[in-house]
Amino acid sequence: MTENDPLRYSILASGSTGNATYLETSQHRILIDAGLSGKKIENLMSQIDRSLKDVDAIFVTHEHTDHCHGVGVLARRYGMSVYANEGTWQAMVNKVGNIPDEQKFIFTPNTVKEFGDLDIESFSVSHDAAQPQFYQIHHDNKTFCILTDTGYVSDRVAGTIRNADAYLMECNHDTEMLRMGPYSWPLKQRILGDEGHLSNEEGADALMNVIGDRTKEIFLGHRSQHNNMRSLAHLTVASIMEDHDFAVDQDFKLEDTEPETPSSFMVL
C-alpha cells in the first residue's frame, strides 16, 4: 500500500433504522447500502466533510428498507451507479422507483468485481430477503469486510472473510432482551432463526472464528433499538473474546456504531 492512497471508511449509520457505509480511495468513493432517506444521508456525509455528488456508486446488499431506502433518490439526484444482484433488483424495484438503465448494474453473488482501484467481493448470506449478499472491499492488500443481516455464519462465508484488516460485524440483539421484549412470537422466531440476525454472542463467536493477525479494527453493527444496548453489546463481545484469550483493544480495537451518527474516519 502506498502512503498516499489508503482505503478510508466511515460507517455513516448502522442499526435497525438504517444502514450506510462510505468508503474512499484517491480514485473512487462508494456507498455500501443507503438505508436512510436521501436527506439524512446527505447530512451524515456532511458530518464527515464529504459530498454525495462525489460518490460514484452504491452497492446494495438486499432489498430491506433499512438498506435501500435512499437508493433511488440518490441515484436520480446524483447520477450514481447502483450495483445489486438480480434477486435484489427484482425485489427492490418498487421501493427504489425508476433508475435509468445506464445506472443499473448486476453484481452476481460470490464474485469479485473490479471497480477502478477497488476489488469488491460479494458473498451470499442467510437472511429472509430475496438474494442477500454482503461485501468485502479490497484495496492494495487491505480488506474491509461488512457482514450484518445473517442468521448464521456458514463455513463457506467464514472461509471467505477470514483475516480481514477490519470488520463491521452484526451484533443485533441480546437474546434475553429479545425473548422478554414486546415483539410478537413470530417476529422473535424470525430474528432468532437461521434467516434472521446474529445475537451479541453469535457475533462474538463469528469474530473469533474469522479474525487473524491482520485484523486491527472491529465495529459492532446493526444493533436493535428495542432488543439491545450499546454497552451490553460491547461488554458481551469483549468478555467472550477475552475469555477465549483474545487481547481486545490491544491486538485490535473494538468499536461501536450508531444509528444516526457516523463513525470517525478509519484508515487502512
Which functions belong to the PLM regions below?
Residues 32-35, 55-63, 83-86, 145-148, ...:
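Active-site neighborhood of phospho(di)ester-bond hydrolases with catalytic His/Asp-centered motifs
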